[in-house]
Amino acid sequence: MHCPFCTAKDTKVIDSRLVGGGHQVRRRRECNDCHERFTTFEGAELVMPRVIKQDGSREPFNEDKLLNGLNRALEKRPVSTEQVEEVVNIIKSQLRATGEREVSSHLVGECIMEALKKLDKVAYVRFASVYRSFEDIREFGEEIARLGE
């Protein structure tokens, strides 16, 4: 790897360790020419499946869309940024684990619902009310009752 300080082509790895739950490798490097030290992170480049929407159109998986939906449901809830990031990683892993090149938006929604149910029940109900398009208060009440079971 080139040194970011002097652009020399020869650097050596001083230390390596797993970070990010074992999904990344953090390496401390030192330039053989200028002796400056720097850190690099190495992670697998994983391809996410495309999403098939309800109207049949297809679009690339959009992590920002997932994060925005979660954040809207979790607004003013006692959930840390780290917990939200962990949920995003879990959902992405579940979608990749299908082994499919394309997944339905329904599957994405169900993965989100399952994750929110475990993380925060209020956020789950908020998300479910939009995702399932409750028609009246009765349907809303039934969903809340199912949470208590």
UniProtKB/Swiss-Prot annotation:
Keyword Transcription regulation: yes
InterPro entries: ATP-cone_dom, NrdR-like_N, RNR_NrdR-like
Keywords tagged on the record: ATP-binding, DNA-binding, Metal-binding, Nucleotide-binding, Repressor, Transcription, Transcription regulation, Zinc, Zinc-finger
One record GO biological process: negative regulation of DNA-templated transcription
Domain (ATP-cone) ranges: 49-139
Cofactor: Zn(2+)
Top-level taxonomic group: Bacteria
Zinc fingers, unnamed class: 3-34
Molecular-function annotations in GO: ATP binding; DNA binding; zinc ion binding
Pfam families, A to Z: ATP-cone, Zn_ribbon_NrdR
Binding note for cofactor: Binds 1 zinc ion.
Role noted for this protein: Negatively regulates transcription of bacterial ribonucleotide reductase nrd genes and operons by binding to NrdR-boxes.
Family as reported in the entry's similarity comment: Belongs to the NrdR family.
Protein's name in the database: Transcriptional repressor NrdR
